[in-house]
């Protein structure tokens, strides 16, 4: 992923057969970190605490759409200013450049061929390197492969559907387990939909217990449920904890779900302060995402209009987890975003 944490994943036994070379890609950690924590914290807080009290969930009214556009513009302007970088230089922080940086490292190390291992976003880096420098690869190991033939809009919708499918499978697996089914009335899908429906109507008020022993009044929003559900789907343990939290929420106790939210969002529940994740760069997520693909083609105004239209068209096509396509609003303002679609042919790397 777009992160600085990775070496800890590998067992020591691998070193008996391979040398491991790991690096912070440019814009991360020790490689000239780009960061706008203040701008991101404000934007992220707006998202988590967003209360859509008009119409359906999503930006379905002109006022909501304009607010979303304004927030995207404000974030990008504030973020670039906080980074303190010449906006023209952001073009050098995309995945194509990361692949070329790897080639520079290979030349410095002096190996003619090497194995390239990528997980999630790392599979994009690996594929782009393979397309450009297949003659220097002994092989690729890809986990959670990203389809680079999809444009930004298609990729966002595919990701939404994948998360939704895992969520539905998790809920159905609960029904097939006697003890889990007993906790959620034998229909975990209905329990989730009921909670989502209540939150879509209005946030649920609850009291959150702090480490000090005090309790603070909080409100759990629909956006918080979508965020928590999505991030808990990444691993088996996370899915198990989500089912337990859903069972508690089904009984009127939102605290276990809130604990998962604060953990995944890296937010201090006492101060409602965004703490950030030292192994993941929120800033570089936008920089790489928007440098690699514009989501839509045309002028800035045309790309914004197409993003809103696509968001409305996708509303309801992914029943439980949607909204990723609205990242296109941020990319419409990001200085290094291309003006046209970025299209790639399926990867062919003979001999790899």
Where are the predicted features?
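Glycine-rich nucleophile elbow surrounding the catalytic serine of serine-hydrolase chemistry
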Residues: 99-100, 118-130
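Alpha/beta-hydrolase fold active-site neighborhood
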Residues: 190-350
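Alpha/beta-hydrolase fold nucleophile elbow
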Residues: 90-91, 109-121
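A catalytic-pocket lid/entrance helix-loop region that shapes and gates access to the active site
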Residues: 35-53, 128-194, 231-232, 243-270
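Loop/turn elements at helix/coil->beta-strand transitions in domains of secreted/extracellular proteins
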Residues: 16-21, 26, 65-66, 73-75, ...
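Alpha/beta-hydrolase active-site loop signature
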Residues: 26-29, 80-83, 122, 146-147
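N-terminal cap/lid subdomain of alpha/beta-hydrolase-fold enzymes
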Residues: 1-65
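Alpha/beta-hydrolase active-site loop
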Residues: 43-108
């Amino acid at each position: 992923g777009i992160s600085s944490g990775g070496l800890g994943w590998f067992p020591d036994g691998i070193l008996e057969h391979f040398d491991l070379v790991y690096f912070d890609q440019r814009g991360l950690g020790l490689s000239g970190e780009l960061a706008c924590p203040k701008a991101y914290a404000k934007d992220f807080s707006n998202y988590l605490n967003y209360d859509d009290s008009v119409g359906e969930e999503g930006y379905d009214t002109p006022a909501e759409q304009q607010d979303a556009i304004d927030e995207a513009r404000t974030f990008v302007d504030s973020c670039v200013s906080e980074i303190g970088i010449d906006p023209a230089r952001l073009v050098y922080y995309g995945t194509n450049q990361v692949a070329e940086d790897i080639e520079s490292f290979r030349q410095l190390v002096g190996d003619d061929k090497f194995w390239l291992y990528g997980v999630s976003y790392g599979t994009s880096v690996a594929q782009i390197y393979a397309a450009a420098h297949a003659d220097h690869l002994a092989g690729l190991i890809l986990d959670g492969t990203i389809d680079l033939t999809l444009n930004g809009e298609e990729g966002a919708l595919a990701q939404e559907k994948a998360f939704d499918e895992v969520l539905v499978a998790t809920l159905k697996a609960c029904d097939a387990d006697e003890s889990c089914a007993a906790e959620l009335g034998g229909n975990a899908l209905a329990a989730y939909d009921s909670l989502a429906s209540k939150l879509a109507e209005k946030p649920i008020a609850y009291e959150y217990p702090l480490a000090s022993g005090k309790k603070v009044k909080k409100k759990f929003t629909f956006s918080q449920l979508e965020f928590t559900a999505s991030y808990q789907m990444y691993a088996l343990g996370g899915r198990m904890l989500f089912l337990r939290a859903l069972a508690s929420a089904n009984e009127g106790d939102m605290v276990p779900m809130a604990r998962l939210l604060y953990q995944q969002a890296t937010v201090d529940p006492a101060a409602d302060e965004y703490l950030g994740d030292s192994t993941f760069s929120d800033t570089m997520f936008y920089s790489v995402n928007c440098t690699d693909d514009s989501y839509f083609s045309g002028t800035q105004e045309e790309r914004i209009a197409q993003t809103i239209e696509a968001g409305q068209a996708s509303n309801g096509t992914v029943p439980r987890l949607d909204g990723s396509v609205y990242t296109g609003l941020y990319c419409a303002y990001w200085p290094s975003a291309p003006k046209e679609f970025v299209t790639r042919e399926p990867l062919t790397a003979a001999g790899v």
